[in-house]
Amino acid sequence: MSLPMLQVALDNQTMDSAYETTRLIAEEVDIIEVGTILCVGEGVRAVRDLKALYPHKIVLADAKIADAGKILSRMCFEANADWVTVICCADINTAKGALDVAKEFNGDVQIELTGYWTWEQAQQWRDAGIGQVVYHRSRDAQAAGVAWGGADITAIKRLSDMGFKVTVTGGLALEDLPLFKGIPIHVFIAGRSIRDAASPVEAARQFKRSIAELWG
């Protein structure tokens, strides 16, 4: 089983704020996510600028595309994104359109599982050639005190068994990682637990060490 990658979510409102994080920890992570908040705040230039600074890193545009899949994904890929996200409630043709464009750029599409979705939809995504999903505990759910539970682990295992590469996100803390041991997680996303740590560098390194211990 390969080691899960570590992704930092830049859900900053400005590039200046995002750079405060990347200057410290860009070299400690595998994937740099231009979070939805940053996408809205700064547009696709955020993707372009971060990829120019870190060409050796995977840069994800977390656009959560809901419609106009070809247009929006092309905007992201022309800004040199490696991956883009499509929200799970989008029509299957939106996801297909985004994937078609991704292939032109040797990129990839992730389905963001935020909110309601069904296993029938999951099968449609696989049938369409989608290979990545993001299992997401929402920011608002976290704020309401919703913790990771057995239902989450069962769903993640089932998605993996379907052939998806699964990314896990949603207020992920270091102590949560053992919950997922034994599952071939593709990526763990850490946002505030790294960005807001007293030492973001050490926080990122702790995540990497724990991943190596649990999946190595």
From Swiss-Prot:
Residue(s) at site: Transition state stabilizer: K64, D67
The EC number on file is 4.1.1.85
As given in the record, the signal peptide range reads none
UniProt cross-references to Pfam families, sorted A to Z: OMPdecase
State its cofactor: Mg(2+)
Q: Which residues bind Mg(2+)?
A: E33, D62
How many cofactor units bind, and how? Answer: Binds 1 Mg(2+) ion per subunit.
Could you name the domain of life of the organism this protein comes from? Bacteria
What InterPro entries does the record tag this protein with?
3-keto-L-gulonate6Pdecase_UlaD, Aldolase_TIM, HPS/KGPDC, OMPdeCOase_dom, RibuloseP-bd_barrel
Binding of substrate: at which residues?
D11, R192
Q: Which CDD domains match?
A: KGPDC_HPS
Q: In which pathway does it act?
A: Cofactor degradation; L-ascorbate degradation; D-xylulose 5-phosphate from L-ascorbate: step 2/4
SUPFAM superfamilies, from UniProt? Ribulose-phoshate binding barrel (SSF51366)
Q: Which GO terms describe its molecular function?
A: 3-dehydro-L-gulonate-6-phosphate decarboxylase activity; magnesium ion binding; orotidine-5'-phosphate decarboxylase activity
Q: Which reaction does it catalyse?
A: 3-dehydro-L-gulonate 6-phosphate + H(+) = L-xylulose 5-phosphate + CO2
Kindly state which keywords UniProt assigns to this record, in alphabetical order. Carbohydrate metabolism, Decarboxylase, Lyase, Magnesium, Metal-binding
Q: Extract one GO BP annotation from the record.
A: L-ascorbic acid catabolic process
In the induction comment, the record states: Induced by L-ascorbate. Repressed by UlaR.
Family under the similarity heading: Belongs to the HPS/KGPDC family. KGPDC subfamily.
UniProt subunit comment: Homodimer.
HAMAP family named among the record's database cross-references: UlaD
The task this protein performs is described as: Catalyzes the decarboxylation of 3-keto-L-gulonate-6-P into L-xylulose-5-P. Is involved in the anaerobic L-ascorbate utilization.
NCBIfam families assigned: PRK13306.1 (NF009832)
Which protein, by its recorded name, is this? 3-keto-L-gulonate-6-phosphate decarboxylase UlaD
Give the organism the record lists. Shigella dysenteriae serotype 1 (strain Sd197)
Q: What is the lineage of its organism?
A: Bacteria, Pseudomonadati, Pseudomonadota, Gammaproteobacteria, Enterobacterales
> What gene does this protein come from?
ulaD
